[in-house]
């Protein structure tokens, strides 16, 4: 519990957190904090891709996106996919670094116990970057993560569970009535 409270405090201070999941490490920052998102973008060498937005519950979706009933259904699937949805105009509480050149956000809900607990403490939108599409260097343990993310990550939230394999999130986008 203490580690979760400290991790939440790190995020509230506008810093970068690495969370160890069964699928690898995930970089996390508050979605409203521009400075850590700029640091993450500089680290990744990527300036245009949307950064995935994790929301605490389905009720929060409408505050940030214009989402269809079908997209809402997809985002609530057990596999916790990313769903590309149109940004709601006036979503001022998000940093412009979330989708600097686009009109869409990749949104998701917590897909693991660690993120459910973290979101329960914060109840704030999070920017979450995993190794989806090989956007992040791969680290299979804490020692490697410290080396790979040196100078970027301010705190690591880890568990004693091993990283089993790198499993990228599924990205779903509605095109007409179809899911792609």
Residue ranges and their predicted role:
Residues 1-180:
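Active-site-adjacent structural elements in enzyme catalytic cores
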């Amino acid at each position: 519990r203490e580690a979760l409270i400290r991790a939440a405090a790190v995020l509230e201070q506008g810093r970068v957190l690495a969370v160890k999941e069964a699928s690898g490490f995930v970089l996390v920052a508050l979605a409203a904090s521009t400075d850590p998102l700029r640091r993450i973008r500089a680290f990744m060498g990527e300036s245009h891709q949307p950064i995935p937005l994790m929301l605490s519950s389905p009720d929060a979706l409408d505050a940030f996106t214009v989402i269809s009933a079908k997209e809402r259904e997809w985002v609530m699937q057990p596999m916790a996919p990313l769903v590309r949805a149109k940004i709601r105009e006036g979503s001022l509480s998000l940093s412009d670094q979330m989708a600097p050149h686009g009109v869409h956000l990749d949104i998701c809900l917590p897909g693991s116990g660690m993120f459910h607990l973290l979101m329960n403490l914060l109840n704030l939108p999070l920017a979450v970057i995993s190794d989806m599409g090989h956007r992040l260097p791969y680290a299979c343990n804490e020692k490697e993560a410290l080396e790979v993310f040196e100078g970027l990550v301010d705190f690591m939230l880890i568990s004693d569970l091993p990283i089993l394999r790198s499993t990228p999130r599924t990205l779903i986008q509605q095109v007409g009535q179809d899911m792609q």
